[in-house]
Curated annotation (Swiss-Prot):
Keywords: Chloroplast, DNA-directed RNA polymerase, Nucleotidyltransferase, Plastid, Transcription, Transferase
Protein family membership: Belongs to the RNA polymerase beta chain family.
Compartments where located: Plastid, Chloroplast
Keyword Plastid found: yes
Functional note: DNA-dependent RNA polymerase catalyzes the transcription of DNA into RNA using the four ribonucleoside triphosphates as substrates.
Protein name: DNA-directed RNA polymerase subunit beta
Oligomer and partners: In plastids the minimal PEP RNA polymerase catalytic core is composed of four subunits: alpha, beta, beta', and beta''. When a (nuclear-encoded) sigma factor is associated with the core the holoenzyme is formed, which can initiate transcription.
Recorded GO MF terms: DNA binding; DNA-directed RNA polymerase activity; ribonucleoside binding
One Pfam family from the record: RNA_pol_Rpb2_2
PANTHER family found in the cross-reference section: DNA-DIRECTED RNA POLYMERASE I SUBUNIT 2 (PTHR20856)
Superkingdom to which the source organism belongs: Eukaryota
Amino acid sequence: MPRDGNEGMFTIPGFSQIQFEGFCRFIDQGLMEEFHKFPKIEDTDQEIEFQLFVERYQLVEPLIKERDAVYESLTYSSELYVPAGLIWKTGRDMQEQTIFIGNIPLMNSLGTFIVNGIYRIVINQILQSPGIYYRSELDHNGISVYTSTIISDWGGRSELEIDRKSRIWARVSRKQKISILVLSSAMGSNLREILDNVCYPEIFLSFLNDREKKKIGSKENAILEFYQQFACVGGDPVFSESLCKELQKKFFQQRCELGRIGRRNMNRRLNLDIPQSNTFLLPRDVLAAADHLIGMKFGMGTLDDMNHLKNKRIRSVADLLQDQFGLALVRLENAVRGTICGAIRHKLILTPQNLVSSTSLTTTYESFFGLHPLSQVLDRTNPLTQIVHGRKLSYLGPGGLTGRTASFRIRDIHPSHYGRICPIDTSEGINVGLIGSLAIHARIGHWGSIESPFYEVYQRSKETKMVFLSPSRDEYYTVATGNSLALNRGGIQEEQIVPARYRQEFLTIAWEQIHLRSIFPFQYFSIGASLIPFIEHNDANRALMSSNMQRQAVPLSRSEKCIVGTGLERQAALDSGVSAIAECEGKIIYTDTHKIVLSGHGDTISIPLVMYQRSNKNTCMHQNPQVRRGKCIKKGQILADGAATVGGELALGKNVLVAYMPWEGYNFEDAVLISERLVYEDIYTSFHIRKYEIQTHVTSQGPERITHEIPHLEAHLLRNLDRNGIVALGSWVETGDILVGKLTPQTANESSYAPEDRLLRAILGIQVSTAKETCLKLPIGGRGRVIDVRWIQKKGGSSYNPETIRVYISQKREIKVGDKVAGRHGNKGIISKILSRQDMPYLQDGTPVDMVFNPLGVPSRMNVGQIFECSLGLAGDLLDRHYRIAPFDERYEQEASRKLVFSELYEASKQTANPWVFEPEYPGKSRIFDGRTGDPFEQPVLIGKSYILKLIHQVDDKIHGRSSGHYALVTQQPLRGRAKQGGQRVGEMEVWALEGFGVAHILQEMLTYKSDHIRARQEVLGTTIIGGTIPTPEDAPESFRLLVRELRSLALELNHFLVSEKNFQINRKEA
């Protein structure tokens, strides 16, 4: 973290810095580490040798720009070239060529990757750190059993356990365990070396009988015994080299390779001094672990907390990319070996160029970014979402946990998370606690641990020094939870007793015993939680919901920054990359909606702007210039605001006038009543861009054609097509309109020919071919304005590279009934009614309220922060002020938040000469009037300005109706889901509700006639259209017939009888 020039000052690190540092570590170190593992490859006769001169590898600058990669659906990558040599040992001749290994995707300026035109991001993963861990469990007799677990770098586990007779066993599988002596002997130690390297040799000798002596008499016997137990092999196996190789591959490589981090942890836990370069498990490690285990049984040593962050490591983007690069080099090695053997067998001429194929590296990275669970499509709903996505930490993924097997203890908050992992920001549902978010000041250290910054405390000095502590060092210091605001000018704490943290406990101790102190009030939280004002007054569950819902906010057409904020809005907007920033000082010489031209230092720089770009959530990303021609600017100044930013600050919602009161039941159960002003003045209007695409292929009957001449369709549907058969820019299209006209050739049957076609074929022998229309049609709910059309042609032009046509349609969506809105305190609701302005409640100065919330939603949810924000926002609106509030201000003064709000309301009341703004009898509340009658309400009502967001959950994307459509083949019931034009499910609770009203006939229709009765549903549809009595069928519905068939498959015959309503005769019907 860079230090500022002023004493005691600090700067917040870039929120995308973790991604950048990880990728740079992969380029600077990871590539060379994997390259050095690439061996020299020889043929079977050892006459030809192939090797890579990895010190001279080159990464070429990308051939395309980021925007072009997105536009053309390409991968933003760099080509990797390595000099390679082919040596003929007989003639001592060498041929050297620079060969192309493959493409490595590059990280862009947002900290993401562009793969096939899609923004993707790699999530950091939390894994159990390799090393050794001791724990204690109770057996069925209630006696403590001590075990140690050795975790390898590959994730494999081996256990040592001590029984009641103080015998030590190594458990190599769930069922099999072997003596520690056999394991040590199989690893290369004899009995004398074992006894010399342990602290309790008498315990090892206590269970050394004749049988054990025979097992460890030689290394070969020990290996055979170990293999027999490990592989569960019966009989008497014979020692051989293949047996050793199999044991080496299945056990020692997967369970004994500690890696760099594991070796460090093993040395620190067992007080060893084995060199860091020795990354494999040694007999000395096993014996030291056994000694420590014996000490545990005798009450010496401490057990390990597996959930402590010192026992976790972060698997960052550098580690994941390095693993994939190593996998690609292994595949390349196998391919080169096979090519050399094949070339020698067929006596072909060998060169380094024809030995190496670039497909190994390229396909490895393509499959990684496309299929790996930790490689995800970047969520770009708004600028905040982009940053937060890159700072996620996941326990899930390969080598990690699963949502169904993770225990509650793993999901819970741990004291070591303090200042490193946010205790609030996590996902909801089955993955709660398994997907977290980094705290804003946390960074990933060299050893894969999460480090947090603190200030050292000097009792008699003003000097401040910042240190980064890993979780393992954290326990040795007392850390004051106060920050720099709690210190006076002399640097000495005014209060003698301060709250502090020591060894995972929160205490109150004297200031003289403090070693470190926190640096920032938001140090413990993630970015999402740090944007919530008055977060200390909210329940943690509601703060969690708010952190998640801010990421779902839709960028509005006219953004507005919040009156009450936290101060991190500018940093979040800056690091998101949605704003255009001046890279150097200069003068603006030209500006329009497409670009800004800047002249500085003798050069002219053209800065392109983002114009109506679609995100993967269909939101609109757009940049608006904020500078005029002729204006002089400085480096770092905002040139253009992006989506959901104003003046370089994050602006996700709108400041609207709200009231907390019931209104005719329209805000029952979190429903929200809004004014029509929000619709007519486009307060909550947003733009959404949808993408529709179609491809042309070469079929067996010929190539498909893009044309505007479609004989099968009406001219009205083709009205928007140009002469090429593609919809024209700026056209307004409705559901069912043709966006791209396409004909697919096909050969018709003889019977389908028209008479004149058969005559032509008989007389002239002309083969008549017909074409089927396969046009791109606008689906339901897609109406809007065409803003862009892209015709992408792949290079090469073969039939395997089809042409792609993409049409982008923009929709303008006002707020409407059914949309979801939310505040920043977890207060969410659905729009229930849009009321005219004259009917809305109004203030004493005649201003109508914009939104009406239910007051019962506050006390039970315990998110009181919205009350503080509401009242302070009203004062800020009247005084034309903006507030940036730090959390936990009550630590400096009792009731600090309340005093601030009331003082600002009182000042606003004085300056505006409106006594109703602050009334001492009920401060914060006011008498308001019913817009329908003009009478005042009985009780004073809380009114104020709140920052309300419009979320991505909109009614236009969810509402759906069906009159008829497709049915499932087996059950003959309607399909499920909006995408399939499915029906509405009548579930168990819906049936109960209908039963409660006694509507037997409606219930029968919904469950039988309209659903899965094949003949009756056709009659019901026709009767509903023309009117009349709905017919009552006399046979069973299809679901009942399906049940009968399934019972018959179980050899059960079910006879059923239907009673006729006409004559009450029993008629037997076959199913």
